[in-house]
């Protein structure tokens, strides 16, 4: 097998058999970074020297027969919202946040206890408030699948998927408030998991929305996602990693409304082809309108909860930053300042009602399938103003935001390429705290249709 396609589990096994050293693995990642980073711009901060020192320490321990956990020695990129000791946190803004933000929160601490190796901090949209991945302060990462035009990578975890395609990391930590893991995963041909609110702690992560923020991961395959989830999820400690669910007899719901509106025909075709493969393999596919989508998305379109919560957070902690925000972020923050407390509380109540009502469908289906993103990643030049950016940003998050607003878990996995030769994602949605089951279903689908590198081929990288 091509070493570039080895799974996390295979890398971990080779490290423990001493067929591979952690230093050699980090050196390979650093070589990929050095060759491609000037073009792709995945990272705000690259920490290659410390990563190599950490790898040498891992090798010493492995030579002594010590094993500190499944992620030991594996290279991980971390979104620049997370605190990582010794690395500045910018949160996509024009200056580093106070040093206290460098403290590791519970999720990074879990990674570090296992001696997973942080190779660097990846770019984010400023304060994570955007779905396309743009950043006016530090530059927008380039989608690796677009060799001749600068297309966006998706956001707000803008550099996360790029780091995986680049080969500088094998696992990426991101966050998801309206699609910020799944949109970049979809647009760069990766797998991305949005956890249920509260499943993984968000302490030690710069907040966007106190109501909706979730920690998540991006991986190259669903197989890798299952491995990483088992390693990071405390509720799964002592349990085996999620196992593939049989496709035959699987009850698959395909919503007919909202998710397919004004969709790129080539994206619709790729997703529908995946659904048909499931039906041919014995899945029971049923189609119906998903209730409350339009009502919930109308709230999202008017700022949802996140805009008001970010405005309040900035006003309390960083009021001096507001006028220096990227204009595509600043305008929405300013607009949210006009939302009354009564309207904010009304929105919360409506969204709770909508999510609970729509979740009753999971009594009759095991999973909901939709396109992850309904449009091809736009060219950066085509979204250079607030007026051109706003509709493209809203459309990018239209399908992913529903699971956030409803309080569900969700993931995306690649299923093909669109007419622009850009990756297409299939979104799986499940009820709250059903992550392990959802990953198992995705494993079954991946076994049927193939992993991303087999489905998509390889991008034309430098």
UniProtKB/Swiss-Prot annotation:
Enzyme Commission (EC) number: 3.5.99.5
Function: Involved in the biodegradation of nitroaromatic and chlorinated nitroaromatic compounds. Catalyzes the conversion of 2-amino-5-chloromuconic acid into 2-hydroxy-5-chloromuconic acid and ammonia. Also able to catalyze the transformation of 2-aminomuconic acid into 2-hydroxymuconic acid.
This protein's encoding gene: cnbH
SUPFAM superfamilies from the UniProt entry: Amidase signature (AS) enzymes
Pathway recorded for this protein: Xenobiotic degradation; nitrobenzene degradation; Xenobiotic degradation; 4-chloronitrobenzene degradation
Gene Ontology BP term (one): catabolic process
Assigned keywords, A-Z: Aromatic hydrocarbons catabolism, Hydrolase, Plasmid
Protein known as: 2-amino-5-chloromuconic acid deaminase
The UniProt record lists the keyword Membrane: no
Cysteine-cysteine disulfides: none
Active site: 79, 156, 180
InterPro entries from the UniProt entry: Amidase, Amidase_dom, AS_sf
Family: Belongs to the amidase family.
Catalyses which reaction(s): (2Z,4E)-2-aminomuconate + H2O = (3E)-2-oxohex-3-enedioate + NH4(+)
Organism, as annotated: Comamonas testosteroni (Pseudomonas testosteroni)
MF (Gene Ontology): 2-aminomuconate deaminase activity
């Amino acid at each position: 097998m091509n070493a570039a396609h080895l799974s996390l589990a295979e890398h971990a096994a080779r490290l423990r058999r001493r067929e591979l050293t952690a230093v050699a693995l980090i050196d390979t990642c650093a070589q990929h970074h050095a060759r491609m980073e000037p073009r792709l711009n995945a990272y705000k901060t690259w920490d290659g020297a410390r990563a190599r020192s950490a790898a040498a320490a891992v090798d010493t321990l492995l030579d002594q027969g010590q094993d500190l956990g499944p992620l030991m020695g594996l290279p991980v990129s971390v979104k620049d919202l997370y605190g990582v000791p010794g690395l500045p946190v910018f949160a996509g803004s024009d200056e580093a946040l106070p040093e206290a933000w460098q403290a590791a929160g519970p999720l990074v601490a879990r990674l570090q206890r296992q001696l997973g190796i942080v190779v660097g901090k990846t770019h984010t949209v400023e304060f994570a408030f955007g779905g396309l991945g743009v950043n006016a302060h530090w530059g927008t990462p380039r989608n690796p699948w677009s060799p001749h035009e600068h297309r966006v990578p998706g956001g707000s975890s803008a550099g996360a998927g790029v780091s995986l395609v680049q080969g500088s990391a094998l696992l990426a930590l991101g966050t998801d408030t309206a699609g910020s893991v799944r949109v970049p995963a979809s647009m760069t041909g990766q797998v991305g998991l949005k956890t249920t609110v509260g499943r993984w702690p968000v302490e030690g992560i710069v907040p966007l929305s106190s109501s909706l923020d979730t920690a998540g991961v991006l991986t190259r395959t669903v197989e890798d996602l299952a491995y990483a989830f088992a390693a990071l999820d405390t509720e799964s400690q002592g349990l085996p990693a999620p196992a593939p669910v049989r496709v035959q007899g699987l009850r698959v719901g395909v919503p007919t409304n909202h998710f397919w509106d004004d969709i790129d025909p080539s994206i619709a075709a790729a997703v529908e082809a995946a659904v048909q493969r499931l039906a041919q393999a014995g899945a029971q596919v049923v189609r119906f309108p998903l209730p409350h989508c339009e009502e919930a998305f109308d709230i999202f379109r008017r700022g949802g909860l996140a805009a008001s919560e970010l405005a309040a957070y900035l006003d309390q902690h960083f009021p001096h930053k507001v006028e220096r925000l990227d204009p595509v972020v600043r305008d929405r923050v300013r607009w949210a300042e006009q939302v009354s407390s009564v309207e904010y509380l009304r929105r919360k109540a409506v969204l709770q009602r909508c999510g609970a009502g729509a979740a009753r469908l999971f009594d009759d289906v095991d999973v909901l399938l939709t396109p992850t993103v309904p449009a091809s990643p736009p060219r950066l030049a085509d979204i250079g103003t607030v007026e051109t950016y706003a509709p493209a940003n809203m459309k990018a998050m239209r399908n992913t935001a529903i699971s956030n607003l409803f309080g569900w878990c969700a993931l995306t996995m690649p299923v093909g390429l669109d007419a622009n030769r850009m990756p297409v994602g299939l979104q799986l949605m499940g009820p709250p705290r059903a992550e392990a089951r959802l990953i198992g279903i995705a494993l079954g689908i991946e076994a049927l249709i193939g992993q991303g590198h087999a489905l998509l081929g390889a991008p034309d990288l430098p």
